[in-house]
Amino acid sequence: MEYRIEHDSMGEVKVPADKYWAAQTERSHENFLIGVGIETMPREITYAFGVLKKAAAIANNQLKPEKMTDEKLAAVSQACDEVMSGALNEHFPLVVWQTGSGTQSNMNANEVIANRGNEIAGKKILHPNDDINMSQSSNDTFPTAMSIAAVLGIEDKVIPAVDTLISTFKKLEKDNEGIVKSGRTHLQDATPITFSQEISGWRASLEKDKKLLEIALPELKELALGGTAVGTGLNAPKGFDVKVAEAVSEITGKQFITAPNKFHALTSKDEIVFAHGALKALAADLMKIANDVRWLASGPRLGLGEIKIPENEPGSSIMPGKVNPTQCEAVTMVAVQVIGNDTAIGMAASQGNFELNVFMPVIIYNFTQSVRLLSEAMISFNKNCAVGITANKEKMSHNLHNSLMLVTALNPYIGYENAAKTAKNAYKKNISLKESCVELGFLTAEKFDEVFHPEQMV
């Protein structure tokens, strides 16, 4: 491998000749051999740095045109566009497990954009610190990258995936109207419900989760950029924070604003905790929905068997013909991971000692993983399972008419205690509710038929 010599304030460093990064990135690359090649800084953060560095250059060009000249801005903008496109991903090698402020990743972006920008310009006009990091600090850029990544993840990935699943459930509701089945509470038989009503509960849960995510978004759209090192805005020109937020909004198509209190923006990550709480709520509901589906599909002969789901692959290496609810299992595992991520995020967010939180990389690492897993799990579950759910009407009817909880319909006619006696007697003797009620003398057979209509109990 060929190398070139780069230098920083600590001296010279050998850097791979074919990479755009420079001395500080290389030091981090050598000093933090933790999860190398596996737990790299999320690409969502790399993209966000491309956005914010371009936005900062635009704002600096407007406020300090003698330093961020039009020529420099053009080179920086093109380099940032390449970062956002993913064309320069190989030049962002750093792992999550580095400094808690994300300083090395900020410098990684500065160095790559400067070197690529100089290549675009055909001459050395850009310096990583003096130009790309102008009016900024790692302490306000990394929180800003977190905000951008979180907003884009929720708006462009999670919510569309939620909407897709909601649409599928709406169709299933319509397709299954009028199909009455046994309800269940505590994993025990309960009074009847229509399959459409049951599905509507799933759909409404996702609609509520979407609302919670939307409630979280405005706080995520407040940017720390402009606070610089400790929130005072040292070395940033007046109005930089407002202009850079406007530029970020223009680049992303999302409405970002500058945080009203930069001291809070640097040290607190409460908006991330709150937003991830909404993701955790979504995970909890997906866990419930996936569990309902696999319970209802259990069998095929010895389980509930009230619905059928698509058969996507063989389920066992030893039991021929076995098919498992694999999509449900994937969703439930994702839910467990997201709930675990929430614990890590909450703990890390509590570590904002004095003017800066220094657990930011692990916070956004877990946040972006949750976004990615939830959105992809919902898409997979929808495509490979939910759209293919069908009701086993015969099994639903069989289970319904064998449910002892239908006795609840007799309460107005024979009273709660007599209804309970009827159910217990039927269970003990393995006879029908009608036979039990008549045997105990509570109703005649004719009166029982007159008042007992399970399909009207919904």
What are these regions (language model features)?
Residues 1-458:
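Conserved, well-structured ligand/cofactor-binding cores
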